[in-house]
A protein has these predicted regions:
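Glycine-rich phosphate/ribose-binding loops and adjacent secondary-structure elements
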Residues: 1-80
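C-terminal extensions of enzymes
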Residues: 81-151
């Protein structure tokens, strides 16, 4: 279904569900989907996207999406994500991770999966901080714009 339809259904269902119970959205999805769900009252998510995309060389970062198979990372010896949420982010470089993917080393998939899972945990934690601070509605659009960027 189109994402706009999914968001519409989340809003519809959340009007019906008891307000004092947690809301769970299964199988969703991208970091942007998660933020949109949170904005609409969803409390819990699960999905395979962080690990599936990681296994295919796609990394979610605070500044956007990285395809580690792209040639542009071949000589980029900077950390995977300088201020990332996981130990793998500063332990390995983009060039090394790209090399591992092209060499079809299983370690590439593990590093990317650890990175993406840590990123999702960071994102949910940041959303919570901004909800508590009362500025989620101004933080979210800025974050969505950053997360949409292809690096």
């Amino acid at each position: 279904e189109p994402t706009e339809k999914m968001y519409e259904m989340i809003e519809l269902v959340n009007e019906i569900l008891p307000k004092d119970k947690p809301r769970y959205l299964m199988g969703v999805g991208t970091p942007i989907n998660i933020l949109e769900g949170i904005e609409r009252g969803v409390d819990m998510f699960d999905c395979v996207m962080p690990t599936r995309n990681g296994r295919n060389g796609m990394l979610f970062t605070k500044d956007g999406i990285i395809n580690m198979r792209n040639k542009k990372w071949e000589t980029d010896f900077s950390p995977i994500e300088a201020n990332g949420a996981s130990y793998v982010d500063t332990l390995y470089t983009k060039a090394y991770l790209r090399h591992l993917f092209h060499a079809q080393e299983l370690l590439a998939m593990q590093i990317a999966s650890v990175h993406n899972l840590a990123f999702y945990l960071w994102l949910a934690g940041e959303a919570r901080k901004h909800i508590i601070a009362g500025d989620f509605s101004t933080w979210k659009p800025m974050m969505v714009k950053r997360l949409s960027t292809r690096l």
